[in-house]
Amino acid sequence: MDRDGWLYAWALASVALGGGSLLVPLYFVAIGGETFMLGVLAGVAAAAGAPGALIFGRIADKTGKRRSLVLLALGLATLALVLVSLTEEPWLVIAGNGLLWFAAGAVAPVLTLLVTAGTVERDWPARFAVLNRYQGWGWAGGLVLGLVWTALLSGPLGEIAAQQSLLWLCAAAVGLSAFLAAKWLPPDPTELDRPRASRVARAIARSRRLPVRSATFPVGQGRLYWLTRSLHPREVAARFSPSLTIYFGAVIVFFVGFGVFWGPLPLYLSRTLGYESGLVFALYLVSSVGSALWYDRAGALAERYSPSGLQVGGLLARAALHPAVAAVGLLLPATLVGTAVNGVVFALIGVAWAVIAVTAASVVTQLAPPAIRGEALGLYTAISGLASGVGSILGGWLGGYDFLLAFGVAGALVLVGAVLVAVVWRHSSTISVNSEPLSA
């Protein structure tokens, strides 16, 4: 097997993670989970990855033990999926799902190290892109698997039994991934062969585009440890410019808005609109495909135009599209036309997310002083994950009262974030114009 053979094993695990990202919330709804607790489920999942990334990243950095850490993380993910499939107790499902995303976060910084093996530093950003590609296709494959499996088996087996059987299949996929990884992962390097963490962080910071894993589960933890390992909060805070401070305030606000929308959404689609599990998977897949198809195009636009301006456009679109999902449900409930319109809305949500995600790294890099650019990118990852988790819990609470209220608040928060980014955009443009030399 060539040096990238282990990536096939990780792609297989990504299939299980992609399917599980929606399957577990749908299973939670099917066993009677309420709206607020669904928000807690999503919030715990969003927050669980960061501790895993920091713990496993530090161990891998200090000891060089990569193989055992990857296998341990895959083992924890397998255990988590089995635990969820064997219980109908909401708190146990929340705990199992938290363990799943702890494991997913834990393996991410270790894979970042593995993908650089045998290559020179200048090629590392391209290697990170290879890892993201395998992971992204696996994630999308998991959504396709969920769509097909639940559409075919929910009728004969019943909704809960079909979902449990898919959880078992996902657990088996991660278990097989661990077996293949044990065969194909490269050996742990000697101390002399280990790349310095500062070089890894520098290469990650050069990767100007953040990975777009999914419009529905946007935060990846692969960067978090490497970009924050040398973080000194006081030093970084002292170097924050007013524009960067405002931008991070915007990030908090619009990621809370994203969480408010996605947190209670599975329950709204399945219970309020009466969509079958396969149809919900289809909508999420459409959103992820929209992101994937627009990723390169958004990157090309960001190289020609202001990333801040493009991000404002993406945020304004999301601000309108979040309440649009509830409006479609009110105006065209449980109709073929309503379903088709929702499909278009979800595709546009994915496109808008691609624009936001691709431009984020460029905006942070432009606003941060050179000395703290890596740390600023790490803070972006950490803040976005935490804000998304808080938003998910808030969305679950609001959705318990009214989904139109929840999605309206989500849109309003994203709109406020867009206004703050527009302030940064205008301020940056003014500085750029005023700093241009006068012509003779």
Where in this protein do the model-derived segments appear?
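Glycine-rich segments within core transmembrane alpha-helices of 12-TM secondary carriers
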Residues: 129-150, 383-391
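Hydrophobic core of transmembrane alpha-helices in multi-pass small-molecule transporters
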Residues: 11, 91-107, 252, 337-355
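Helix-to-loop junctions at the C-terminal end of transmembrane segments
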Residues: 52-65, 294-307, 399
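Cytoplasmic helix-loop-helix junction between adjacent transmembrane helices
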Residues: 96-137
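Structural signature of the two symmetry-related core transmembrane helices
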Residues: 68-83, 309-325
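Central cavity-lining transmembrane alpha-helices of secondary-active solute carriers
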Residues: 40-58, 282-297
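Helix-loop boundary and gating motifs at the non-cytosolic
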Residues: 1-47, 243-283
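C-terminal membrane-cytosol helix-exit motif in multi-pass small-molecule transporters
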Residues: 146, 150, 171-194, 205-219, ...
